[in-house]
Every structure is written in structure tokens, then in C-alpha cells.
Curated annotation (Swiss-Prot):
Naturally occurring in which organism (per UniProt): Geobacillus thermodenitrificans (strain NG80-2)
Keywords recorded for this protein, A-Z: Bacterial flagellum biogenesis, Cytoplasm, Repressor, RNA-binding, Translation regulation
Protein name: Translational regulator CsrA
Coarse class of the protein's main subcellular location: cytoplasm
Keyword Ligase carried by entry: no
Length: 82
């Protein structure tokens, strides 16, 4: 992990197109401004983890839903042939 020290209004450059600037420091909170292309997703860590958990849960639900749908289609197909 790279550790950098920045003062108020100083910035960090990541690659050619991402810049992180220290906008304010109030007690134990630091306000950051991030300039990045629109295609770059930026989230607070706790939000990112919640999104990952939700996506993981949705993928499992989708697999079980597809399995049930497949069983229903087999049942319908079997019913039409009879």
C-alpha cells in the first residue's frame, strides 16, 4: 500500500485521468474531491461492499429462479405433448 501525506487543497494524481484533492479537514473527517471519467465508478468502501453483496445475492437468486423456470417450461412442454 502506498501511503501519501497531503495538506488542504493538495492533490494526488492517479494515471492520466484521475485526480483526488483534499477539500476540507474537520476534526477526524477529511473531505475529498475526485475528478475522474464518467465510466469510472467511485463509491465509499461500505457502499461498494453493499453493492457487491447485493449483486452476489441477486446472482444466486437468479440461478434458482432460472432453475424453477426451466422446470416449469419442461412441465409445460411435457403437458402439451400429452
Amino acid at each position: 500500500m502506498l501511503v501519501l501525506t497531503r495538506k488542504l487543497k493538495e492533490a494526488i494524481q492517479i494515471g492520466d485521468d484521475i485526480e483526488i484533492t483534499v477539500l476540507a479537514i474537520q476534526g477526524d473527517q477529511v473531505k475529498l474531491g475526485i475528478n475522474a471519467p464518467k465510466h469510472v465508478e467511485i463509491h465509499r468502501k461500505e457502499i461498494y461492499l453493499a453493492i457487491q453483496a447485493e449483486n452476489n445475492a441477486a446472482s444466486h437468486a437468479s440461478k434458482s429462479s432460472l432453475k424453477r423456470l426451466n422446470e416449469q417450461l419442461k412441465h409445460l412442454k411435457g403437458g402439451k405433448q400429452a
